[in-house]
Amino acid sequence: MKAADVRSKSVDQLSDELVKLKKEQFNLRFQAATGQLEKTGRVTEVRRDIARVKTILREKSQAGK
């Protein structure tokens, strides 16, 4: 997910995306623990996407003040 894609979304969409990414991260952690994880790079990718979404949410909340 690119930062430009994230910036174009509304706050509600970003919140939904954050919930979805956190669920995916949870599932990936369990897959890794049980040895079922095939794409290990996806863990890093999801973690960075979560950081991107949180950063943009914070920027948007700061801009509103």
Curated annotation (Swiss-Prot):
The keyword Ligase does not apply. It holds the Pfam family Ribosomal_L29. GO terms for molecular function: structural constituent of ribosome. It comes from the Bacteria. GO terms for biological process: translation. SUPFAM superfamilies: Ribosomal protein L29 (L29p). Belongs to the universal ribosomal protein uL29 family. This is Large ribosomal subunit protein uL29. It comes from Hyphomonas neptunium (strain ATCC 15444). The gene is rpmC.
